[in-house]
Amino acid sequence: MNIENYLNETLKEHKLHFTLIDPDEQTPQEAVEIAKQAKKARSDAILVGGSITDQEDLNITVKSIKEEVDLPVILFPGNISGVSKYADALLFMSLLNSTNPYWITGAQALSAPSIKKMGIETIPMGYLIIEPGGTVGWVGDSKPIPRKKSDLAVAYALAAEFLGMRVIYLEAGSGADSHIPVDFIMKVKKLTNLMVIVGGGIKTAQDALEVKEAGADIIITGTVVEETDDTYKKIKELTDVIH
């Protein structure tokens, strides 16, 4: 199955929710249990990755999920170690507002030959860090876009589109106090033809609804799933408003 086609076809029916699993935060067994509950709660895919990833843990986690859960598993690599041959697809991303060329094209060039050999489907994506940015903003040497400067986000998103990317990910950072401002999402969606992913700071159904109504195509939640006592209930609260 071509994952990008699956996403585009599903978007004709409803907006999407991805459950983010960070192998650094869960054991493979815990990751499988989260993925099972995500499937039951109608999440549309499992996103696997983090800012710091051990490749052995990643391989075990992805393989375990694939063996037990019938959902697409998409990689969200934080570095060249964030690649696994067991995944269905990979968000091949460039951190657009990094000050370090390594995160813009360096890591991508280093990992590309291995990805080619593995035969993993790649989805070209621009990754944009918005304040506060969290761990990924620090690790990625980014200049997080101020929350009142939506025009800067639009400029980067247009650049991503003109460079041939088909997806833009607006990231507030894992565990952010609040989600991406709605005007960022609205303007990027209106002024580009990109698939818009939004993550960071989405903790409640109301948050998810605001982001969806602003124009997000795919909504990512991770921290809120890690911290809840009832994974199924929390994800279902989100998917009920997203779908």
Swiss-Prot record:
Drop me one GO molecular function for this one: phosphoglycerol geranylgeranyltransferase activity
Q: Which UniProt keywords apply?
A: Cytoplasm, Lipid biosynthesis, Lipid metabolism, Magnesium, Metal-binding, Phospholipid biosynthesis, Phospholipid metabolism, Transferase
- UniProt similarity note: Belongs to the GGGP/HepGP synthase family. Group II subfamily.
Q: Which GO terms describe its cellular component?
A: cytoplasm
Its cofactor is:
Mg(2+)
Question: What is the protein's name according to its record?
Answer: Geranylgeranylglyceryl phosphate synthase
The residues that the entry says bind sn-glycerol 1-phosphate are Y169, L170, E171, A172, G173, S174, G175, G200, G201, G222, T223
Q: In which pathway does it act?
A: Membrane lipid metabolism; glycerophospholipid metabolism
State the EC number(s): 2.5.1.41
Q: Where in the cell is it found?
A: Cytoplasm
Biological processes per GO annotation:
glycerophospholipid biosynthetic process
Which Gene3D superfamilies does its entry note? FMN-linked oxidoreductases (3.20.20.390)
To which species is this protein native? Methanosphaera stadtmanae (strain ATCC 43021 / DSM 3091 / JCM 11832 / MCB-3)
Q: Which catalysed reactions does the entry list for this protein?
A: sn-glycerol 1-phosphate + (2E,6E,10E)-geranylgeranyl diphosphate = sn-3-O-(geranylgeranyl)glycerol 1-phosphate + diphosphate
Identify the domain of life. Archaea
Top EC category: transferase
Q: Where does Mg(2+) bind?
A: D22, S51
State the function annotated in the UniProt record: Prenyltransferase that catalyzes the transfer of the geranylgeranyl moiety of geranylgeranyl diphosphate (GGPP) to the C3 hydroxyl of sn-glycerol-1-phosphate (G1P). This reaction is the first ether-bond-formation step in the biosynthesis of archaeal membrane lipids.
